[in-house]
Amino acid sequence: MASVPSVGIFYAPVFVSSDRIIDSIAPMLNRWTVDGKADFAISVPDPLKVEIRHNNGFTYAVESNRVSIAYQHRVKFRNISGGRPVAELISSPLPFSGLLDAAIDDIIELTLLLPIAKSSSINRVGIVSSTHADEDDMPPGVRKLIDFLAKPWPGALSAYQVSIVGNLPSSKEYEDRCIYGITKPDDDSDIPNYKFDWQRGYVTSFPINKDTLQKEFQRNRKAAIEYFEKLAIGDEFDVLG
């Protein structure tokens, strides 16, 4: 499956202007500038939010209460002599695990550069897997869930939009949950998409520092991947009958 990741860090709100955010992450922006040419584009949707779209496929977003990095394949059209323009992939075609590791490294670096690093604390972390696939190519677990939802109707579902928030086993330190989003458009404009948004909310928020972020993302990555694999197999859906 050609799954792509997103990662997010949620913290107690800190209101910082977009100009100050951009100034604080200058070390990353400078590294992404080669021979005077920026390999990214910056947008400011509102005075307290900054988005950076990198040509490698990652989009970095900073808001008053969260930082997120999402991946999406990017293409550009290149003119050729005597023919139509051809599409060329410019993003990094890495497997899910490689993209996830890159996103985690970047979100840690980005968060530590921000003004919030000294004045806020982290209360939730999220890791997302998003996949486009035809129904015949869906993992068994997703297929079982769709088949169960289709039972009241005699034929196959021509379209659906499902959103489920499921609470997962937790501990005294954290509360886990997963938001399941499964969508099939009512036309041939796109193929179905299924998204698993695994989240860990901390009972007690923790300060922002490199060692803690690396430790938490290491164990959260492991927990999220194990859960995604469990969902794909779908043994727990056998109870659906």
Q: What are these model-derived regions, one by one?
A:
Residues 1-83:
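N-terminal low-complexity, intrinsically disordered segments
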Residues 7-13, 123-130:
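A short acidic-to-branched-hydrophobic micro-motif
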Residues 18-24, 137-141, 207-213:
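Short, conserved charged micro-motifs
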Residues 28-37, 103-118, 149-153, 220-235:
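Hydrophobic, Leu/Ile/Phe/Ala-enriched alpha-helical segments that form helix-helix packing faces
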Residues 67-92, 190-208:
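Short acidic, glycine/tyrosine-flanked loop/strand segments centered on an H-E-D-like triad
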Residues 85-128:
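Aromatic- and glycine-enriched beta-alpha-beta binding-site module
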Residues 125-201:
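Aromatic/basic-lined ligand-recognition segments
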Residues 187-241:
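Long, compositionally biased interface segments
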